[in-house]
Each structure stands twice: as structure tokens, then as C-alpha cells.
Amino acid sequence: MCAVLRQPKCVKLRALHSACKFGVAARSCQELLRKGCVRFQLPMPGSRLCLYEDGTEVTDDCFPGLPNDAELLLLTAGETWHGYVSDITRFLSVFNEPHAGVIQAARQLLSDEQAPLRQKLLADLLHHVSQNITAETREQDPSWFEGLESRFRNKSGYLRYSCESRIRGYLREVSAYTSMVDEAAQEEYLRVLGSMCQKLKSVQYNGSYFDRGAEASSRLCTPEGWFSCQGPFDLESCLSKHSINPYGNRESRILFSTWNLDHIIEKKRTVVPTLAEAIQDGREVNWEYFYSLLFTAENLKLVHIACHKKTTHKLECDRSRIYRPQTGSRRKQPARKKRPARKR
């Protein structure tokens, strides 16, 4: 039997696809449902009420226990609501398919907002929904290319160049270490360096890591250009879930330049000195192993600046992979001088 209260209960009622919310007074669940359908011009058959916060259905039995000003949602046949989770899902859908109306409304709210936290949230929303991620060429998104040389005609080309520049920088650091190698071993060091250089040229300095148009196995991003932080060198993943899409807008492109391709086994402290010592030892060095540590994702992690730990990693090269398996006589050892001190 439908419970009828002596005093009407006042609640706040909204419909699923309506931005309006009304105060409605009723003595029973059925009366409230009827008034709600009239207010929102919805069909009564199949309609029901639920709590806005968690989607619990409001029945005749639980209606008397509702607090005054409870927020309820009116659902028609076939509609569902899971509480705040549904609200968050609808909010997130804005990022995937932003509409001009949403952007305009957010800008209006931001212009009138005084609270710093709400300003930050609205500004972040505008930043993300205003991105022109799908655009690729200078003609499609001229603002993205502001400050870049005219030779860059598309986003993927510039991001590929950006990655190549980082890898070239690592190569220069390895080359600069030549003077630290014993004079008698420098020729072999330069030979190994030359092999690495040829390998890098053949793969275009691994510029594909930042190119969203590259094969999935060759890039560090999604086909849309989203990069996820891989976390500090001593963790499996990023606990803060940092992500960025430098293809979206100019600001994101600039911010992405602060992300690091961090060597898990450190380049200056460990990899390069170990390479030099191995060459001075006289055996044939497995230069491909050192190449992988210096220039490839085997030993590189893409990390947000907050996840880039500057502390000593205290990780060593795999001793079993430093030299090639000996199949003949041992190469004559070069004259050895004092080993160079490891750079700190």
C-alpha cells in the first residue's frame, strides 16, 4: 500500500537530460512521481525515482525516510543512473567530443568565477576541450606552430625532429667522452662510436618515438598523440598518472619539452664509463648492448618533470652482455693508462 504522509515532503527533483532542478512537495512517492512527470513533461508509465547521489531507487516504503531537500532524479523507461559515477562519465565525455556550447559556457563561468580552485578547474577544462588534436598541418592549426621555423609543415614532423634532437644530444655526450679514454684505446672507442652512429642514422635517430603516425611498436604514444608518464626509474609506473598530448595545442607542445627521456641505468655515471673501460680491457665489446642502453626504449623512460629523480640510480650494466662471446684468440690489449674517474 502506498504510504501517504500527513505533512508533504519537499525534495529537489531533476530529470536525466535536463539542466533544471525544481523543488517539489508531495505526500507520497506516487504523488511525487506524478508531479515530476508533469513538471518535466515526461510520460508516467515506466517512470521511476532514484537518489541522485548513488542511483538507489526510491519506493513507497523508503519515501517516508527521505530527508527534506533530498536530491532525486526522475528516470523514464529505459534510462539508468549510477549516481555520481554517471555524472563523472558524462563530464569526461566532454573531453572526447567537446561542443561549442560547452566551451562557451565554461568561458562564461571562468570570467565570473572568483574562487581560485574553481578557476583552476575551469581553466584546465578549457585547456583540454580547446585542443585541436586531430589537426596535423600548419594550415589546419596555425597557432600550434607559433614560434617554430617555417620548415616545419606538420606536427608529427616537428615532434619527430624533437625526439631526434634529444638522441643526437646523447650521441654528442658519448663522443665528448673520447678524450677521457686511454690514448691507445681511443681508435677502438671511435670505431664503436661510428658503428653506433651508423645504426642511429639507419633508424633516423629513433625519432619515431614521438611520431603518432609511426608503427605502434616504434612510438611511445597513442595514435592520437597521447603520452603517458612511465614513472621514475625505480618504479614500474607513474603513481600520479601524468599524461600529455603535445599535438593538442601550443601550450602542450611547449610543456612536453620539459618531459625527460630518462636513462634507467645512468648514461654519464655508468653506461659511458663502463663502455670505455670495456674497450680498454682489450676484448671485443658488444657495442649493440651499449647502443640499446644509450639510445633506445630498452633503457629510456619518458617521464614528467616531477617524476624525474636526480638522485644516483645505483644501477650497473649487465656484465654478461658487455663483451661478445670469445670465438678466437684474444685481441691484443692496448697500452693502459690510469682509468678515467667516473663522472659524478
UniProtKB/Swiss-Prot annotation:
Residue ranges that the Swiss-Prot or TrEMBL entry lists as coiled coil: none
Matches recorded under Gene3D superfamilies: 3.10.20.10, 6.10.140.170
SMART domains reported for this sequence: CAD
Listed Pfam families: CIDE-N (PF02017), DFF40 (PF09230)
Top-rank taxon, per record: Eukaryota
Compartment(s): Cytoplasm; Nucleus
Ways its activity is controlled: Inhibited by DFFA (DFF45).
Keywords for this protein: Apoptosis, Cytoplasm, Hydrolase, Nuclease, Nucleus
Classification via PROSITE patterns: CIDE_N
A GO BP entry: negative regulation of apoptotic DNA fragmentation
Cellular component, GO, one term: chromatin
Assembly mode: Heterodimer of DFFA and DFFB. Interacts with H1-1.
Function comment: Nuclease that induces DNA fragmentation and chromatin condensation during apoptosis. Degrades naked DNA and induces apoptotic morphology.
Name by which UniProt lists this protein: DNA fragmentation factor subunit beta
Organism: Mus musculus
Gene: Dffb
